Amino acid sequence: MFTDLAISGGPGLLTAPSEVQSTFTRVSNTQYSNCSSIFRLGERTFTRQYAHIYATRLEQMRPLLIKSAKQRWGDDIAVRKLCELQGGEKCCVIGTLFKSMELQPSILREISEEHNLLPQPARQKYISDSDELILEDELQRIKLEGATDVQQLVTGAVLAVLGAEEDAGKFVVEDFCLTSLPVQSPLPRLSEDRFVLLTSGLGLGGGSGDSLMGLQLLLDLVTGQAGAEEDQGCAARISRVILAGNLLSENTQGKDSLNKAKYLSKKTQAASVEAVKMLDEILLQMSGSVSVDVMPGAFDPTNYILPQQPLHRCMFPQSALYSTLQLVTNPYEAEIDGVRFLGTSGQNIGDIYKYSSMQDYLDILEWTLQVGHLCPTAPDTLGCYPFYKSDPFILQNCPHVYFCGSAPKFSCKEVTGAEGQRVLLLTVPEFCSTQTACLVNLRTLQCQPISFSGFGADDELGD
């Protein structure tokens, strides 16, 4: 795709100098709209309980699931609340899942056992054969048995189940369904190729020289300073860059300094300070050439809970002068030349990975699209703001490109909805470990990785 454009009859790197002055004209975003206002926090009150967000989530998603249930099981299916169940009656029940997990970390358990047992080692996954699913609605809860995938499903997902209540007070499930994809706006018809470059996990301050080499090559590519004239012409078609979180390394968190006496750390400087200065210089180079959207991540200097608010412009005294630099929320939703992008920095996908049997980030990304919610495990195992009027993480519009950052590897696939929705799923890998970025063609919705790992020091030593 992107590479094919550069393979033509144009001059290469080893051609004689030309008297014709080469030009680098960047394509512009004629149509751009930041649609992330729903993730901006105005009043911040943390005195409310988290029960409100589960109640409003169920209230908002119930009509969607009733529609999906009737499409799947027929219009004559009886939809009951848990308090209306009658023994043996086959019906449909809609509720929020709670997954009872023996291995799930609990601060209360840690406090009660800290004097008697050694701390449990960190696990990649917390699922076990003893896990149970419980369905809750506004008033009651009931244990689920039967045709449910206990290992795959997670707490917080809202779904419809078909079955009957047994005498023992358990609901035997025959089938279950998730919500259908929301309405999608039609794709625009672009006359030329335009690209959006996505990368994540720059990991600044981590001390890896290889990743900095790859990062500089990435900057040279985006700004049109790498390759021959034809390559630069292709780079000029990159209309926007999205940095999907974790711009700083986990090593910059400086948690060790919290345990030191003040007189030992008074004259030391946090590792994140130099990393932010480096980020400012990178954004200065990039935003001077192309529009850049910067999303925060788990290791970046902003609030920890979702939705993460934009990084403050005061941290970037050089690059903040450019109007092309846009500091955005996580999650982030925008419309670029008529193509709707929606994505996160990866915390939601990584959290589901721990509490589900799903192994592939791309499968988890597709599952969140099917369940109609960006982060169903919030607020149980993933921190989020205690919303009470509405749940902003419910999918209101079907995106054309749905991505997550900080993934272990690059992967993409296209899924099609029941009403013809076409969605490109994309996992953006950590740049600091893979030296890989992603290019999305807005005209065709095709995606390809661009790797800079072949330029690392390890490869040179290996030769």
From Swiss-Prot:
Domain of life of the source: Eukaryota
Gene Ontology cellular-component annotations: delta DNA polymerase complex
Give the molecular function GO annotations. Answer: DNA binding
Q: What is its main location?
A: nucleus
Which InterPro entries does the record cross-reference, listed alphabetically? Answer: DNA_pol_a/d/e_bsu (IPR007185), DNA_pol_D_N (IPR040663), DNA_pol_delta/II_ssu (IPR024826), PolD2_C (IPR041863)
Gene Ontology BP terms: DNA repair; DNA strand elongation involved in DNA replication
Write down the Pfam families for this protein, in alphabetical order.
DNA_pol_D_N, DNA_pol_E_B
Cellular compartment(s): Nucleus
Q: Which UniProt keywords apply?
A: DNA damage, DNA excision, DNA repair, DNA replication, Nucleus
* Record note on quaternary structure: Component of the tetrameric DNA polymerase delta complex (Pol-delta4), which consists of POLD1/p125, POLD2/p50, POLD3/p66/p68 and POLD4/p12, with POLD1 bearing DNA polymerase and 3' to 5' proofreading exonuclease activities. Following stress caused by DNA damaging agents or by replication stress, POLD4 is degraded and Pol-delta4 is converted into a trimeric form of the complex (Pol-delta3), which consists of POLD1, POLD2 and POLD3. Pol-delta3 is the major form occurring at S phase replication sites, as well as DNA damage sites.
Provide the function of this protein. Answer: As a component of the trimeric and tetrameric DNA polymerase delta complexes (Pol-delta3 and Pol-delta4, respectively), plays a role in high fidelity genome replication, including in lagging strand synthesis, and repair. Pol-delta3 and Pol-delta4 are characterized by the absence or the presence of POLD4. They exhibit differences in catalytic activity. Most notably, Pol-delta3 shows higher proofreading activity than Pol-delta4.
What family does the database annotate? Belongs to the DNA polymerase delta/II small subunit family.
Q: What is this protein called?
A: DNA polymerase delta subunit 2
Q: Which organism is it from?
A: Xenopus laevis
